[in-house]
């Protein structure tokens, strides 16, 4: 626990204190933000390079844990010609936490399902949690006998962790070196079946709402939990990535997580977690708007490959027509996240065709726009890998000496050439935005040219997202496909 004392003890100085002895400070400076980020990447490491298919669209929901539903969603996308590359399986896909076995009764023939989806051009990403359920007796006893669990310092026994699903669990101690190969062998099982990556969830480690349980008594191989907590997720991410590469040479890893630490970009991608209005899902406008600065901050923190949960995740959808406008605007904004995943909690379906014909067509248009820009996005993905610069950039990163760009968190640069200004207000049909120096072409009509260094209001019907390209830019695009198998190696 860190204590900050800003003027409470003296007006002459501010101070803070933390347990654990002396701290090491890193002071980074430079002529601009890009130079400072270069110093940070030198300290914490280069981001992993994603496979090309990771830059497309993904579909998920909390109860997407059945073969028949997965096939139904895949067919729905291909039937309607809406591009999509990835279908996720949430935590219920596995028989027990965390044995990496397909749930009996939910999956008739998972290997055949994965082969069929691959032939349709889909990748499948599955969830994993960093725990072993006590109801999973065989694996739990194995890990317990090997000493692979975090222990309770008050008893010396395996720490009994309440978990939101699967019952009480043992927390896997990824700070112990021997755990890596053991976990890697388990996670390789669905990879051998044909899955393409992992979604590492609940890595804080999260738990149930039992406030009387004190996790600070947890003892890891490398120390007590108050010392390990912030880096626990990172130790897990490291094992998942390194074991994937060890057992699957010449394949790029796909891992997406919400819990990590400085340096996570070496192992994983990120997502922002639950972000909607849980009380009224149709009123999540402010929450959606807030995702823009959250994602921009992630990019500045050297997490260049991120996504929001498109739709907001939180809350039951009781009226799809009432949510259609918000859903459309969320997809439009999410199309310009480096990664793009539509996801909602429970069994709330969030496929585009459920929100009405107009929403389906507008969403399809937004997704097709992203796919047409894949060559452009992939180019900047490589720059993110090499230099750590985000694809989704705050305005001041490209225009550091323009004071107007310092407070423009409702728009952003997508690479250096494209300016994106998502509509984040209900019933809005216009968008107020700022154009920095230079001349800017309206990307939607390819005709209207505006001079820079001015604020202006542009039309923003529900069918489009305000988007501008700097005059003189070259924007590589590609033809769309919705049924061919994607490139596994790129």
Question: Language model features by range: what are they?
Answer:
Residues 481-486:
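Conserved small/polar residues in nucleotide/adenosyl-binding loops
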Residues 489-490:
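N-terminal low-complexity segments that are often proline-rich with Ser/Thr-Pro
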């Amino acid at each position: 626990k860190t204590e900050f004392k800003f003027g409470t003890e003296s007006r002459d100085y501010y101070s803070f204190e933390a347990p654990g002895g002396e701290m090491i400070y890193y002071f980074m400076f430079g002529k601009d933000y890009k130079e400072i980020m270069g110093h940070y990447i030198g300290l914490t490491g280069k981001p992993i390079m994603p496979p090309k298919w990771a830059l497309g669209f993904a579909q998920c929901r909390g109860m997407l844990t059945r073969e028949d539903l997965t096939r139904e969603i895949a067919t729905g996308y291909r039937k309607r010609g809406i591009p999509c590359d990835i279908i996720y399986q949430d935590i219920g896909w596995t028989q027990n936490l965390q044995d990496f076995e397909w749930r009996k009764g939910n999956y008739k023939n998972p290997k055949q399902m994965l082969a069929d989806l691959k032939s349709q051009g889909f990748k499948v990403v599955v969830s994993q949690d960093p725990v072993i359920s006590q109801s999973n007796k065989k694996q739990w006893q194995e890990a317990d006998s090997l000493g692979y669990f975090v222990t309770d310092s008050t008893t010396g026994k395996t720490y009994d962790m309440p978990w939101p699903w699967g019952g009480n669990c043992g927390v896997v101690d990824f700070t112990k070196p021997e755990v890596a190969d053991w976990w890697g062998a388990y996670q390789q099982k669905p990879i051998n079946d044909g899955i393409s990556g992992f979604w590492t969830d609940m890595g804080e480690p999260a738990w149930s709402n039992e406030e009387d349980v004190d996790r600070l008594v947890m003892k890891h191989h490398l120390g007590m939990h108050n010392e390990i907590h912030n880096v626990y997720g990172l130790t897990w991410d490291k094992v998942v990535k390194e074991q994937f590469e060890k057992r699957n040479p010449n394949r790029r890893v796909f891992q997406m997580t919400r819990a990590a630490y400085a340096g996570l970009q070496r192992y994983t991608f990120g997502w922002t977690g639950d972000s909607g209005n849980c009380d009224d899902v149709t009123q999540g406008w402010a929450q959606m708007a807030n995702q823009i600065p959250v994602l921009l901050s992630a990019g500045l923190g050297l997490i260049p490959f991120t996504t929001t949960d498109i739709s907001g995740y939180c809350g039951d959808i009781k009226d799809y027509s009432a949510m259609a406008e918000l859903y459309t605007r969320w997809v439009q904004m999410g199309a310009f996240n480096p990664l793009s995943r539509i996801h909602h909690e429970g069994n709330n379906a969030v496929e585009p065709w459920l929100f009405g014909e107009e929403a389906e067509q507008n969403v399809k248009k937004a997704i097709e726009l992203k796919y047409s820009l894949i060559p452009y996005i992939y180019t900047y993905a490589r720059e993110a890998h090499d230099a750590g610069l985000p694809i989704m950039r705050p305005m001041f990163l490209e225009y550091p000496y323009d004071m107007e760009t310092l407070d423009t968190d409702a728009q952003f640069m997508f690479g250096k050439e494209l300016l994106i200004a998502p509509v984040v207000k209900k019933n809005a049909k216009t968008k107020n935005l700022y154009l920095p120096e230079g001349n800017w072409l309206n990307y939607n009509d390819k005709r209207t040219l505006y001079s820079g260094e001015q604020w202006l209001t542009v039309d923003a019907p529900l069918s489009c997202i305000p988007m501008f390209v700097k005059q003189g830019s070259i924007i590589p695009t590609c033809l769309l496909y919705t049924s061919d198998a994607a490139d596994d190696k790129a």
